[in-house]
Design a protein with these regions (language model features):
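A short acidic, often aromatic-flanked loop/helix-cap motif at beta-alpha or helix-coil junctions
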Residues: 98-104, 161-163, 192-194, 260-263
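Active-site acidic Asp-centered loop
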Residues: 131-132
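Phosphate- and divalent-cation-binding pockets in alpha/beta enzyme and binding domains
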Residues: 77-80, 140, 240
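A structural signal for short hydrophobic beta-strand segments in well-ordered beta-sheet cores
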Residues: 41, 174-177, 254
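Conserved core of the sugar-phosphate nucleotidyltransferase
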Residues: 138-221
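Conserved alpha/beta core of the MobA/IspD/sugar-nucleotide pyrophosphorylase nucleotidyltransferase superfamily
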Residues: 2-3, 186-270
Length: 270
Protein backbone atom coordinates (compact mmCIF):
# COMPACT_ATOMS: atom_id res chain seq x y z
CA UNK A 1 0.00 0.00 0.00
CA UNK A 2 1.37 3.41 -0.99
CA UNK A 3 2.16 5.65 1.97
CA UNK A 4 2.43 9.32 1.03
CA UNK A 5 0.46 10.99 3.85
CA UNK A 6 2.13 12.77 6.77
CA UNK A 7 0.21 14.08 9.78
CA UNK A 8 2.05 16.90 11.57
CA UNK A 9 0.97 17.58 15.15
CA UNK A 10 0.89 21.33 15.80
CA UNK A 11 -2.03 21.93 18.16
CA UNK A 12 -0.14 22.05 21.46
CA UNK A 13 -0.03 25.21 23.54
CA UNK A 14 3.80 25.39 23.68
CA UNK A 15 3.66 25.77 27.46
CA UNK A 16 7.26 24.73 28.10
CA UNK A 17 8.55 27.11 25.44
CA UNK A 18 6.65 30.07 26.88
CA UNK A 19 7.63 29.33 30.48
CA UNK A 20 11.31 28.72 29.75
CA UNK A 21 14.09 31.26 30.32
CA UNK A 22 16.79 31.69 27.69
CA UNK A 23 20.50 31.45 28.45
CA UNK A 24 21.49 32.04 24.81
CA UNK A 25 21.29 35.86 24.51
CA UNK A 26 18.31 35.67 22.18
CA UNK A 27 17.19 38.77 20.34
CA UNK A 28 14.08 40.58 21.49
CA UNK A 29 12.31 39.39 18.34
CA UNK A 30 13.20 35.73 18.99
CA UNK A 31 11.96 35.95 22.58
CA UNK A 32 8.73 37.56 21.39
CA UNK A 33 8.21 34.76 18.86
CA UNK A 34 8.92 32.11 21.49
CA UNK A 35 6.31 33.63 23.79
CA UNK A 36 3.61 34.24 21.21
CA UNK A 37 4.10 31.99 18.17
CA UNK A 38 3.42 28.30 17.58
CA UNK A 39 6.74 26.50 17.76
CA UNK A 40 6.68 25.29 14.16
CA UNK A 41 6.45 28.91 13.00
CA UNK A 42 9.40 30.24 14.98
CA UNK A 43 12.11 31.60 12.67
CA UNK A 44 15.27 29.50 12.65
CA UNK A 45 17.38 31.10 9.91
CA UNK A 46 18.65 34.57 9.01
CA UNK A 47 15.91 34.99 6.41
CA UNK A 48 13.15 34.43 8.95
CA UNK A 49 12.01 31.07 7.62
CA UNK A 50 10.35 28.87 10.25
CA UNK A 51 11.05 25.28 11.22
CA UNK A 52 7.89 24.08 9.43
CA UNK A 53 9.38 25.32 6.14
CA UNK A 54 12.35 22.98 6.39
CA UNK A 55 10.25 20.11 7.74
CA UNK A 56 7.98 20.35 4.69
CA UNK A 57 10.95 20.46 2.30
CA UNK A 58 12.33 17.31 3.93
CA UNK A 59 8.91 15.65 3.81
CA UNK A 60 8.58 16.40 0.10
CA UNK A 61 12.09 15.10 -0.55
CA UNK A 62 11.16 11.92 1.35
CA UNK A 63 8.22 11.23 -0.97
CA UNK A 64 5.23 12.59 0.95
CA UNK A 65 2.50 14.22 -1.10
CA UNK A 66 -0.34 14.95 1.34
CA UNK A 67 0.23 16.84 4.59
CA UNK A 68 -2.39 16.95 7.33
CA UNK A 69 -1.49 19.79 9.68
CA UNK A 70 -3.25 19.47 13.04
CA UNK A 71 -3.82 22.89 14.61
CA UNK A 72 -5.71 24.24 17.61
CA UNK A 73 -9.31 25.36 17.37
CA UNK A 74 -8.35 29.02 17.77
CA UNK A 75 -5.18 28.94 15.70
CA UNK A 76 -4.90 31.35 12.80
CA UNK A 77 -1.13 31.60 12.42
CA UNK A 78 -0.60 28.46 10.37
CA UNK A 79 -3.45 29.29 7.98
CA UNK A 80 -2.06 32.79 7.55
CA UNK A 81 1.38 31.36 6.84
CA UNK A 82 0.14 28.96 4.17
CA UNK A 83 -1.99 31.64 2.55
CA UNK A 84 1.29 33.43 1.82
CA UNK A 85 3.59 30.45 1.24
CA UNK A 86 2.91 27.78 -1.37
CA UNK A 87 4.67 24.41 -1.37
CA UNK A 88 4.43 22.97 -4.87
CA UNK A 89 3.98 19.21 -4.89
CA UNK A 90 2.39 19.11 -1.43
CA UNK A 91 -1.35 19.05 -0.79
CA UNK A 92 -1.71 20.68 2.63
CA UNK A 93 -4.92 20.04 4.57
CA UNK A 94 -5.88 21.37 8.00
CA UNK A 95 -7.32 19.26 10.79
CA UNK A 96 -8.62 21.00 13.92
CA UNK A 97 -8.14 19.62 17.42
CA UNK A 98 -11.18 20.78 19.34
CA UNK A 99 -11.45 20.51 23.09
CA UNK A 100 -14.25 20.68 25.62
CA UNK A 101 -15.05 24.04 27.20
CA UNK A 102 -14.36 22.50 30.60
CA UNK A 103 -10.71 21.95 29.65
CA UNK A 104 -8.00 24.60 29.58
CA UNK A 105 -5.87 22.80 26.97
CA UNK A 106 -6.21 20.17 24.21
CA UNK A 107 -6.59 16.51 25.18
CA UNK A 108 -3.19 15.31 23.97
CA UNK A 109 -1.48 13.82 20.94
CA UNK A 110 -3.56 10.63 20.73
CA UNK A 111 -6.71 12.75 20.71
CA UNK A 112 -5.21 15.03 18.05
CA UNK A 113 -4.59 12.04 15.79
CA UNK A 114 -8.03 10.57 16.54
CA UNK A 115 -9.76 13.83 15.61
CA UNK A 116 -7.72 14.07 12.41
CA UNK A 117 -8.87 10.63 11.29
CA UNK A 118 -12.51 11.37 12.13
CA UNK A 119 -12.28 14.57 10.06
CA UNK A 120 -10.57 12.72 7.18
CA UNK A 121 -12.07 9.19 7.29
CA UNK A 122 -10.03 8.07 4.28
CA UNK A 123 -7.10 7.74 6.71
CA UNK A 124 -8.83 4.75 8.33
CA UNK A 125 -8.03 2.70 5.25
CA UNK A 126 -4.53 4.07 4.61
CA UNK A 127 -1.03 3.81 5.93
CA UNK A 128 0.19 7.19 7.15
CA UNK A 129 3.02 8.75 9.14
CA UNK A 130 2.90 11.09 12.13
CA UNK A 131 5.44 13.57 13.49
CA UNK A 132 5.82 16.65 15.67
CA UNK A 133 5.86 20.17 14.25
CA UNK A 134 8.73 21.23 16.52
CA UNK A 135 11.30 18.61 15.47
CA UNK A 136 13.29 18.88 12.24
CA UNK A 137 13.49 15.28 11.06
CA UNK A 138 15.86 14.53 8.19
CA UNK A 139 14.55 13.50 4.78
CA UNK A 140 16.39 10.21 5.30
CA UNK A 141 14.49 9.45 8.51
CA UNK A 142 11.19 10.56 6.98
CA UNK A 143 11.75 8.38 3.93
CA UNK A 144 12.71 5.39 6.09
CA UNK A 145 9.52 5.51 8.11
CA UNK A 146 7.40 6.27 5.03
CA UNK A 147 8.73 3.39 2.95
CA UNK A 148 9.07 0.66 5.58
CA UNK A 149 7.16 -2.55 4.90
CA UNK A 150 6.11 -2.85 8.55
CA UNK A 151 2.46 -1.91 9.13
CA UNK A 152 3.27 0.04 12.28
CA UNK A 153 6.73 1.40 12.98
CA UNK A 154 8.74 4.30 14.36
CA UNK A 155 12.24 5.70 14.15
CA UNK A 156 14.20 4.34 17.11
CA UNK A 157 16.94 6.91 17.75
CA UNK A 158 20.27 6.03 19.33
CA UNK A 159 20.42 8.30 22.37
CA UNK A 160 24.18 8.82 21.98
CA UNK A 161 23.68 10.70 18.69
CA UNK A 162 21.28 13.30 20.10
CA UNK A 163 23.27 16.51 20.48
CA UNK A 164 21.47 17.90 23.50
CA UNK A 165 22.49 18.75 27.04
CA UNK A 166 22.84 15.82 29.43
CA UNK A 167 19.87 17.13 31.38
CA UNK A 168 17.66 17.18 28.30
CA UNK A 169 18.77 13.76 27.04
CA UNK A 170 18.11 12.27 30.47
CA UNK A 171 14.56 13.63 30.35
CA UNK A 172 13.65 11.54 27.28
CA UNK A 173 11.63 8.37 27.68
CA UNK A 174 13.52 5.22 26.69
CA UNK A 175 12.41 2.18 24.72
CA UNK A 176 12.53 -1.52 25.32
CA UNK A 177 12.79 -3.55 22.12
CA UNK A 178 12.86 -7.32 21.82
CA UNK A 179 15.64 -9.18 20.03
CA UNK A 180 13.81 -8.79 16.72
CA UNK A 181 13.47 -5.02 17.06
CA UNK A 182 9.79 -4.83 18.04
CA UNK A 183 8.62 -2.44 20.73
CA UNK A 184 7.81 -3.94 24.13
CA UNK A 185 7.75 -0.97 26.49
CA UNK A 186 8.29 2.78 26.87
CA UNK A 187 9.66 4.08 30.15
CA UNK A 188 9.25 7.75 31.03
CA UNK A 189 11.62 9.50 33.43
CA UNK A 190 14.12 6.62 33.63
CA UNK A 191 16.73 6.38 36.36
CA UNK A 192 20.37 5.38 35.88
CA UNK A 193 19.50 1.86 37.02
CA UNK A 194 16.88 1.50 34.28
CA UNK A 195 19.27 2.02 31.37
CA UNK A 196 20.96 -1.37 31.66
CA UNK A 197 17.63 -3.19 31.35
CA UNK A 198 16.48 -1.13 28.37
CA UNK A 199 19.51 -1.56 26.11
CA UNK A 200 18.80 -3.12 22.72
CA UNK A 201 20.58 -6.18 21.33
CA UNK A 202 23.53 -3.97 20.34
CA UNK A 203 23.81 -2.38 23.77
CA UNK A 204 22.22 0.90 22.66
CA UNK A 205 19.71 3.04 24.54
CA UNK A 206 16.90 3.96 22.16
CA UNK A 207 14.54 6.93 22.40
CA UNK A 208 11.36 7.90 20.61
CA UNK A 209 11.13 11.34 18.96
CA UNK A 210 7.53 10.84 17.77
CA UNK A 211 8.18 9.87 14.14
CA UNK A 212 5.71 7.04 13.49
CA UNK A 213 4.05 5.05 10.74
CA UNK A 214 0.61 3.53 11.38
CA UNK A 215 -1.94 1.46 9.55
CA UNK A 216 -5.25 3.26 10.00
CA UNK A 217 -7.43 0.17 10.13
CA UNK A 218 -5.24 -1.34 12.86
CA UNK A 219 -4.58 1.73 14.99
CA UNK A 220 -7.83 3.73 14.91
CA UNK A 221 -9.57 1.82 17.73
CA UNK A 222 -6.54 2.26 19.99
CA UNK A 223 -6.73 6.02 19.46
CA UNK A 224 -10.47 6.03 20.04
CA UNK A 225 -10.15 4.09 23.30
CA UNK A 226 -6.97 5.71 24.58
CA UNK A 227 -7.32 6.58 28.30
CA UNK A 228 -6.30 9.86 29.87
CA UNK A 229 -2.93 9.87 31.59
CA UNK A 230 -3.60 10.26 35.32
CA UNK A 231 -0.88 12.85 35.89
CA UNK A 232 -1.04 14.92 32.71
CA UNK A 233 -4.76 14.51 32.06
CA UNK A 234 -4.09 13.99 28.35
CA UNK A 235 -4.54 11.14 25.89
CA UNK A 236 -0.98 10.49 24.80
CA UNK A 237 0.19 8.80 21.62
CA UNK A 238 2.71 6.50 23.39
CA UNK A 239 -0.14 5.18 25.56
CA UNK A 240 -2.15 4.19 22.49
CA UNK A 241 0.95 2.60 20.95
CA UNK A 242 1.67 0.56 24.09
CA UNK A 243 -1.94 -0.62 24.23
CA UNK A 244 -1.55 -1.88 20.66
CA UNK A 245 1.70 -3.63 21.60
CA UNK A 246 0.12 -5.28 24.64
CA UNK A 247 -2.82 -6.54 22.59
CA UNK A 248 -0.77 -7.46 19.53
CA UNK A 249 2.86 -8.30 20.38
CA UNK A 250 5.40 -7.80 17.57
CA UNK A 251 3.15 -5.23 15.91
CA UNK A 252 5.26 -2.03 16.16
CA UNK A 253 8.80 -2.14 14.76
CA UNK A 254 11.62 0.19 15.80
CA UNK A 255 13.72 1.33 12.83
CA UNK A 256 17.22 1.98 14.23
CA UNK A 257 18.65 5.42 13.44
CA UNK A 258 21.81 7.24 14.43
CA UNK A 259 21.50 11.00 13.96
CA UNK A 260 20.61 14.21 15.77
CA UNK A 261 17.11 15.69 15.60
CA UNK A 262 16.90 19.48 16.01
CA UNK A 263 14.18 20.29 18.51
CA UNK A 264 12.29 23.36 19.73
CA UNK A 265 11.15 22.67 23.28
CA UNK A 266 12.51 25.68 25.14
CA UNK A 267 14.02 29.08 24.30
CA UNK A 268 17.51 27.61 24.61
CA UNK A 269 16.75 25.45 21.53
CA UNK A 270 16.22 28.42 19.20
Amino acid sequence: MINDSLIILAAGLSSRMKKSVSNNNLSKNSIEQANNTEKGLISIDKNGRPLIHYLLLNAKSAGFKTIYLVIGQKSKSFKNYFNKNIYDGLDIKFAIQYFDKNRVKPSGTADALYQTITQFPVLKSLNFCVCNSDNLYSSKALNSVRSTSFLNAFISYDRDYLNFSTEKVNSFSILKLNKNGYLEDILEKPTAKDYEFFKDKNGKIRVNMNLFKFNGSVFFEYLKNCPFDKLRNEKELPTAVLNLVKNQPNSVYGIPFEEHVPDLTSKNDI
